[in-house]
Amino acid sequence: MDVLEMLRASASGSYNTIFSDAWCQYVSKQITATMYMYCAFGLMGVLFLAWFMYFKRLARLRLRDELARSISSVTNSYGDLRGLRFRKRDKMLFYGRRMLRKMKNVSGQMYSSGKGYKRRAVMRFARRILQLRRDNMPLEMRTVEPPAEYLEETIEGSDRVPPDALYMLQSIRIFGHFEKPIFLRLCKHTQLLELMAGDYLFKITDPDDSVYIVQSGMINVYISNADGSTLSLKTVRKGESVTSLLSFIDVLSGNPSYYKTVTAKAIEKSVVIRLPMQAFEEVFQDNPDVMIRVIQVIMIRLQRVLFTALRNYLGLNAELVQNHMRYKSVSTMSGPINSQTSQSSRQATANGPPMVINQLNLMQSAASGLGMGMGTGTGSGVSVTVTRPPPSPSRHSREEHTLSDPNPNPDGSVHGTSNLFTEVHGDAPNADLFHQQQQSVGNLSTRRSSITQMTPDGSHTCPQAPGVTTSIDMRLVQSSAVDSLRKELGLSEEDAHIIEPFVELRELEPNVTLITEGNADDVCVWFVMTGTLAVYQSNQDATRAKQDKNDMLIHFVHPGEIVGGLAMLTGEASAYTIRSRSNSRIAFIRRAAIYQIMRQRPRIVLDLGNGVVRRLSPLVRQCDYALDWIFLESGRAVYRQDESSDSTYIVLSGRMRSVITHPGGKKEIVGEYGKGDLVGIVEMITETSRTTTVMAVRDSELAKLPEGLFNAIKLRYPIVVTKLISFLSHRFLGSMQTRSGSGAPGAPVEANPVTHKYSTVALVPITDEVPLTPFTYELYHSLCAIGPVLRLTSDVVRKQLGPNIFEAANEYRLTSWLAQQEDRNIITLYQCDSSLSAWTQRCMRQADVILIVGLGDRSHLVGKFEREIDRLAMRTQKELVLLYPEATNAKPANTLSWLNARPWVTKHHHVLCVKRIFTRKSQYRINDLYSRVLLSEPNMHSDFSRLARWLTGNSIGLVLGGGGARGAAHIGMLKAIQEAGIPVDMVGGVSIGALMGALWCSERNITTVTQKAREWSKKMTKWFLQLLDLTYPITSMFSGREFNKTIHDTFGDVSIEDLWIPYFTLTTDITASCHRIHTNGSLWRYVRSSMSLSGYMPPLCDPKDGHLLLDGGYVNNLPGHLWRYCRASMSIAGVFPPFCDYRDGHLLLDGCYTNNVPADVMHNLGAAHIIAIDVGSQDDTDLTNYGDDLSGWWLLYKKWNPFTSPVKVPDLPDIQSRLAYVSCVRQLEEVKNSDYCEYIRPPIDKYKTLAFGSFDEIRDVGYVFGKNYFENMAKAGRLGRFNQWFNKEPPKRVNHASLNEYTFIDLAQIVCRLPETYAVNTAELFSEDEDCDGYISEPTTLNTDRRRIQVPRAGNSLSFSETEMDSDVELDLKLERKMDKSTQSTPPTSSRASVRGKEEARHMDNWHWSVKHKVETASGATEATNAMIDQEQQHQQQADQGVGAEQLADKDEDKENRSSTYNETKN
């Protein structure tokens, strides 16, 4: 613009057009310049286009010329082509290829050009601008609901069976299994009774001789007290029965009783089926084996149901038996003069008045006793005169059974002794007779017997014992013992020769233990001749057991009484410990001898059972009317939701599942109950309706305890209330400690309070390639370090119970035998066959959990056999076990494919196997290999030990809390834990703990974990990368891209399912406002979510449901592809953005906001013992009290004025942070006070949250602190809770019985002389040897020491196959021959051996003879040979201790006598 023109214009006064003119001029110049430029570019473009078209046309002309030249050359070579024909086949081929080429071009254009191509290009550009990512989410686990049968009970019934017959069948099942002909015979005796409301079914003084089954209506059973009041015991509904099994024994033994206190009355119109007990008597006459089995079942029910319920749960011990002496006909040295038949002895026992044991009157029998042989007990000899006081009208066949009777002896002492003593001395005739007999005995100078005296405390002593054997002819004592035991067994005089060879005598000093509780070897029937025995039982109350380690006294056994009949009839171990209370003499018969007598005289079981019943207290008889024994098949419901709660249940065997139905119809598992658990007790006590439905997972047995009986016992015995309060307090305390973490939306099924302790485990192979036998051996080896365990295979079961044991006729015997094995072991392993055999189906029915074993590096497809497993056991929990060879160093991968193909699997395990598992060997070589492996100590850190602890409910969990850079201390603590020998079975973490825990679960090597953690910490110190990640702080300060990259580089695309150790992380779901537990999915994403601290990182969006997840420490700071959930667990709010879950879209933040130490979550997932490491920061609680109001200007003045004292007042961010961690602090306090968690906090408070550069220093602090901490725990004895199972010495043979010692004794088989199932088939014996390819002939095979093989097994020796057992038999026979040679070559010792030593040697020889006889009858059984070896060793020891030549000669003479007696008996 010209300045002069502007000045002129301004001088002329027209200022309004100056600026507009200048602007127009400037614009016109610019437009002109631009137009010239566009014209130049346009011209250049036209010239370029013309040149391009000319070039393309020139190229086309050149190509045409070349084609013409090539055609001309072809024409010149082959002549004119116009005469050639284009065949149809060639034409079709030519045009087909041409069309396909066009289709390819068209499809290529669709993906490379057009609208779709442009749209994708725009989307790619938008992602670059908006930092979006392509949706290439990895494979995720399918969320499949369990099948309906898993949570629903079976409702359908049996329509083919009439209701009356069905109720009849179910009711008499308590007597055992009856075959169809016998059942039909029993049905012929049934009667139908129609009762109106108010009618009596039976009342007091009515005969107790029937079984009543309610077909319709309801019956009330109540008792009458002495004061005239009544108390209801139970209400019998449709299908239930009213009977007393103890009365059943009374009727069969010929002593029918009457109802003393029990009455049954109809509540409404009812129809009742009556089955007289005499009907069983008719059946038993033709089928003695059925009688034996019924008596055995009744005794088993008495021990398992009555004693279990009253003792373990109600705290009753001494109240269950008669503490006073049972009055009966007793003879301490009775001879054949006063002997009676079995009928007379039984009637005298039942109907006779109280008897008094008087001293011996040997005046008249001394001479005859000296002159006659007493070997057989049939001649006359010395007898004991037993007198009775006059009958008392107040005492008859049985005393009154009422709960109102005074408690006889709660402390175990005999209060009734003084009364009995007063009866003896106070009654004139009896007192005179007593003194006369005493004087007559005192006048006997040449031969005196042991005088039984009654001391003031009620015990019976033998003043001259034990030296009395020097003055009494032992043959007279032997004859007296034979006659007494004959009467106790109900045998006649003619049957004395049957038991005489088996009766043994023993002199006891005070405090000599005859048998201990749980011992199955030394079971005998003991008869007290002189002195007193005391019966004890261990204290079931854990608190009292710690305070008082002595056993509890139950009752005394006085002269003339027997003990041991219960264990003899049940065939199980002794339930009591029996000791001598004073100098005593006893006569006893061993179990093997009793069973041999039983084969000839089956009815002795009635007398043995009657002896057990006589000892029981009136309380037990009344409980027998009320307690029910319930059998439930799989799927049957015990009770249903909203039903009335009038009883509680005790699980005797099997497994129960509790399911709650929500108002919307959704079902959820509440809990599971195993053997010994109490079900429904809370609803019964609070008198509320059932809150859940409880059903049987597998075939189960339960004891039903009615509310009426429970109330009656409470009123009579207040100790029951104390026991119940203690039981419920422990249950409520445990529920309070686990309540907070059980209801999380993200928690799986395992998060419910389900008991992960199994009694039976079935092992099923997926394919034939799975080495199932070595796998079972390895698992068995690891379980032996925890407790007694048993391994069962089809071969072992057939070896023990016979080849036809899986047939339907042997159902009772097989079931009882398996139940006995489960009772004796903490866990039983059922190794299934590779096909769906009868044994495999039995394993499915018996299993609490099924382990499906497969090879992790093979195909994940589901086989046909595996689908049948799910069909047969729909309600049984199934877990997948994947095996990996150690040599390949392979890591688990593709686990999601395995789980998605098997929606019925609830949990999976990765197991790293040693080389020997995958070595292909014959069955015999495998057994020989593991016979040596079992001698070694198992590795507590192996995957097999981890699986063993999970199955037994002893898993050890490690919880790592959040704390930023202070999390480096976790690495040092991990190293200290490893050096302390503490195994880690489960890992959970929050925030930085999620990262460190995931590294440990992935690598399991402390060196590799340290290196990766150090590299990640170094990346976090590179601030320039963090500066590049800054973004506009709307949601967070950083975008999170670089942070995600660091976590993804650490883990890669690994899923949580692929980790070696079970792992979980916890995040805060800000979409649903709760914490979430992640046990599957992308690892790095959920670790990132758990580290998303608010304000720094944006929440992670959960890809499952779209929820926003933050750091889980906000709610619980100690708790797909792995890195995603690690990233989600580290999403610090405000620093990193929340992580969006790829499954549901929820936003996830750091888990520290809800639970910074999720030990409660770990406990709910099944960990029994937990180590929780907290590295979080601690808030300052010492704040300034500024009054009612606060001025910010005053705070500013205090802050900037250096001459004033500083004040501690939280600022706004600090207040927001404290509010966010309110839930976390409360959760942390509950964890510190729990009894299942060991809370540890290293001294790392001086380090800041972002001090990642001090990684090594913080790690060393954690290591030093952890090492000292665990050393102090070991010194204090508190470290055993984490590795107590592996500090035991190798189990010894004497403490762990072999397989045959645990064999179920079927008395019915003994009585009816069924074919022996122990016989070895020669063809079967060598069939397996042929498959061994000659390995059995190796010299190391037959030289294996049997005892060396049995040393390492804490359980039973069921883990050997038939071949190995047969080799043991051969070895036993060789050892036996060596023993015989060594015994014969033993030189005689000095002739000064005492008479007592001679008698003990004779008794030992008697034992040896009985075992020898058992070997002959068992036809080579392993049990007999093992017992024979033991007896031969004891025989050898006895000979070494000083048995002279005279003693050996006497023993040889006794051998010949007994052998001749045995031959006569056998003929």
Curated annotation (Swiss-Prot):
Annotated active site: S991, D1111
Q: Which residues carry this modification: Phosphoserine?
A: S450, S459, S1205
What keywords are assigned to this protein?
A: Developmental protein, Endoplasmic reticulum, Hydrolase, Lipid degradation, Lipid metabolism, Membrane, Neurogenesis, Phosphoprotein, Transmembrane, Transmembrane helix
On the Cytoplasmic side, which residues? 56-1467
Membrane-spanning residues where? 35-55
Keyword Transmembrane in the entry? The reply is yes
Keyword Protein biosynthesis (UniProt): no
Q: Return one Gene Ontology term, BP aspect.
A: membrane organization
Motif DGA/G located where?
Answer: 1111-1113
Q: Which residues lie on this side of the membrane: Lumenal?
A: 1-34
Motif GXSXG positions after renumbering to this chain: 989-993
UniProt lists compositionally biased (Polar residues) regions at: 1382-1393
Enzyme Commission identifier(s): 3.1.1.5
As one GO molecular function, the record gives:
lysophospholipase activity
What chemistry does it catalyse, as a reaction equation? Answer: a 1-acyl-sn-glycero-3-phosphocholine + H2O = sn-glycerol 3-phosphocholine + a fatty acid + H(+)
The record's comment on protein family reads: Belongs to the NTE family.
The role this protein plays is: Phospholipase B that deacylates intracellular phosphatidylcholine (PtdCho), generating glycerophosphocholine (GroPtdCho). This deacylation occurs at both sn-2 and sn-1 positions of PtdCho. Its specific chemical modification by certain organophosphorus (OP) compounds leads to distal axonopathy. Plays a role in the signaling mechanism between neurons and glia that regulates glia wrapping during development of the adult brain. Essential for membrane lipid homeostasis and cell survival in both neurons and glia of the adult brain.
Instruction: State whether it acts alone or in a complex, and with which partners, per the record.
Output: Interacts with Pka-C3; interaction inhibits the catalytic function of Pka-C3 and the esterase activity of sws.
The protein in question is named Neuropathy target esterase sws
- Source organism: Drosophila yakuba (Fruit fly)
Question: What broad taxonomic lineage does this protein's source fall under?
Answer: Eukaryota, Metazoa, Ecdysozoa, Arthropoda, Hexapoda
